[in-house]
Amino acid sequence: MGPWGEPELLVWRPEAVASEPPVPVGLEVKLGALVLLLVLTLLCSLVPICVLRRPGANHEGSASRQKALSLVSCFAGGVFLATCLLDLLPDYLAAIDEALAALHVTLQFPLQEFILAMGFFLVLVMEQITLAYKEQSGPSPLEETRALLGTVNGGPQHWHDGPGVPQASGAPATPSALRACVLVFSLALHSVFEGLAVGLQRDRARAMELCLALLLHKGILAVSLSLRLLQSHLRAQVVAGCGILFSCMTPLGIGLGAALAESAGPLHQLAQSVLEGMAAGTFLYITFLEILPQELASSEQRILKVILLLAGFALLTGLLFIQI
C-alpha cells in the first residue's frame, strides 16, 4: 500500500521510468530519410539538365524550346514564391520566437524583421559592388548597367528584343550569375535547417510525417532550382554541381540533428534562427527582384504565365497544407 492507502500498482514512480534503457526513437526513419532525400533530390535536380541540355540539341537557337523553358520557369517561380512566403518566413519567425521565449528575452525592437532586412541588403550590396567593379574595369553592355528593378538580364534573348538594345550573346551576365549563386546558397542553408528539424525529432510518427513532406517538397524544389539555373545560362556542369550541393544539404541537416538531439539548447536554436533569417532575407530578394520580374517581363503569353505561376504556388501550398 502507498502512503495514502492506494494500491501499490497505481503509484507512479519516476525512478522506475528513468531506469529503463533509452531507445533511439525514429533513428531508422531518420537514416532512411537521409538516403531517400539524397537520391530523390539528386535525381530531380538532374532531370531538367538531361531533358533541356541534351548533347547536340541547339538549346539557344530554338525559339520553341526557349518558350517552353520560360513557361516551365513560371511554374517554378510560383513554387519559389510559395516557398518564400509560406515556408521560409513562417519557419524562421516561429523558430526565433521560440528561441527568444526559451531564453526569457522580451524585445521592444523588431529584431526578427531586422534580421530579414540584413539578409535582403546583403544581396543588394553584393550586386552593387559587383556592378561597380565591372563598370570601373571597362565598358559594359547596356543590360549590365540597367537598374536592378528594371528588366533583368540573364534571360533568353527574345525577352528583351527591341530597337537599339544590344543583346547578350549567351554568356551569363554577372548579376544574374551572382543571384543564381545566392539562390543556391539560401535554399541550401534552409535545407540544412529543415534537415535539422527532422534530425532533432524524438517522436517516430512526427519524424515520418516530416520525412514524407520533405520528400515531396525537395523533389519539386530541386526541379525548380535546376530550371532557374538553366534560365540563367549557366553551364550544365555548374547546374549539376549546384544540384548535387543542394541534394546533400537536407541529409546533412538530418545527420547533424540526430547527433545533436541530446545537446541542442536555446542558444543553439537562436544562432540557427539568425542564420535562417539571413537566408530568408536573401531568398526574399531573389524571389521578388530576380525570379518574378524576369518571368513576367516578356509580353508573350502573359495570361498563361500567370496561370502557371498560380499553379506552382498552389502546388506547394497544397503540400504544405498536407504537411500541417
UniProtKB/Swiss-Prot annotation:
CC terms in the record's Gene Ontology section: endoplasmic reticulum membrane; membrane; plasma membrane
Activity regulation, free text: Inhibited by Ni(2+) ions. Fe(2+) ions do not inhibit zinc uptake.
Segments on the Cytoplasmic face: 52-68, 126-179, 228-237, 294-303
Reaction it catalyzes: Zn(2+)(in) = Zn(2+)(out)
Family matches, as InterPro entries: ZIP
UniProt-listed Pfam families: Zip
Keywords: Cell membrane, Endoplasmic reticulum, Ion transport, Membrane, Transmembrane, Transmembrane helix, Transport, Zinc, Zinc transport
Any Gene Ontology biological process: monoatomic cation transport
Disulfide bonds: none
Result after altering H160A: Does not affect membrane localization. Decreases zinc uptake
Chief location category: membrane
Topological relation to the membrane, as annotated: Multi-pass membrane protein
Subcellular location field: Cell membrane; Endoplasmic reticulum membrane
Tissue: Ubiquitous. Expressed in most adult and fetal tissues including the epidermis.
Parts of the chain on the Extracellular side: 1-30, 90-104, 201-206, 259-272
Transmembrane annotation, as ranges: 31-51, 69-89, 105-125, 180-200, 207-227, 238-258, 273-293, 304-324
GO molecular function, one term: zinc ion transmembrane transporter activity
Remaining remarks: Inhibited by Ni(2+) ions. Fe(2+) ions do not inhibit zinc uptake.
Family designation: Belongs to the ZIP transporter (TC 2.A.5) family.
Functional summary from the UniProt entry: Transporter for the divalent cation Zn(2+). Mediates the influx of Zn(2+) into cells from extracellular space. Functions as the major importer of zinc from circulating blood plasma into prostate cells.
Protein name: Zinc transporter ZIP1
Organism: Homo sapiens
Gene name tied to this protein: SLC39A1
